[in-house]
């Protein structure tokens, strides 16, 4: 769908869709999840904003899909056969997790496309589903002077957790927590912590 979308869009046109993507078991699903989407977008004349709102391991993902597609009404043997088939397929593909979220695209005109599409990847939002103006702002901020004029602010519910080895002046682990919304917790480096706190 994403690869074919630009041919159906006028310059400046947008596409917003829910999406799921497989994350290889060799990658951290919280910090290295965007490679698959990057491959989908490679060479397309679009700017993209991608948000991963949730991550499930293959077993939980399979259970969710079977349950949502009538699993409770299935005979036990049919359920187990479907469940096993999905898990075997994920194992063969080397899938360690499945990311779920949304993708927003804006079709570039010829001049913009010549310089290549811009992409922004986010782990989650501040607890609300993006509306049209959110998507328009996010995609517009990827281009030209707007990018340098963008002022990033920390949501008021974000808190930092620090873990120290007793007697050590520097933290061994930093975790940012979202107090509201989806309640995400994300391990971060000291550089990311400094930027968020600035």
Residue ranges and their predicted role:
Residues 13-16, 192:
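Generic hydrophobic/packing signal
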Residues 11, 58, 185-189:
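Aromatic-enriched hydrophobic runs in primary sequence
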Residues 1-11:
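A short glycine-rich, Lys/Arg-flanked "PGG" loop and its adjoining helix->strand segment in the class I
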Residues 4-5, 89-93, 183:
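Generic recognition of flexible, low-complexity loop/linker segments
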Residues 16-129:
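Substrate-binding/catalytic lobe of Class I Rossmann-like enzymes that use SAM or dcSAM, i.e.
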Residues 110-197:
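Acidic, low-complexity/disordered tracts enriched in E/D and polar residues
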């Amino acid at each position: 769908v994403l690869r074919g979308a630009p041919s159906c869009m006028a310059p400046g046109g947008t596409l917003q869709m829910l999406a799921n993507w497989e994350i290889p078991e060799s990658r951290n699903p919280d910090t290295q999840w965007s490679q698959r989407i990057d491959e989908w977008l490679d060479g397309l004349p679009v700017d993209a904003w991608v948000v991963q709102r949730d991550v499930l391991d293959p077993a939980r993902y399979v259970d969710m899909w079977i349950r949502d597609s009538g699993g409770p009404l299935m005979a036990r043997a049919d359920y187990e056969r479907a469940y096993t088939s999905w898990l075997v397929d994920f194992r063969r593909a080397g899938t360690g997790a499945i990311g779920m979220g949304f993708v927003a695209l804006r079709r570039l005109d010829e001049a913009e496309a010549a310089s290549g599409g811009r992409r922004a990847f986010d782990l989650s939002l501040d607890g609300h589903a993006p509306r049209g103006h959110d998507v328009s702002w996010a995609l517009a901020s990827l281009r030209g002077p707007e990018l340098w004029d963008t002022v990033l602010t920390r949501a008021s519910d974000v808190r930092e957790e620090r873990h120290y080895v007793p007697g050590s002046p520097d933290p061994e682990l930093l975790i940012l927590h979202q107090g509201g919304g989806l309640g995400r917790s994300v391990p971060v480096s000291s550089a990311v912590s400094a930027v968020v706190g600035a």
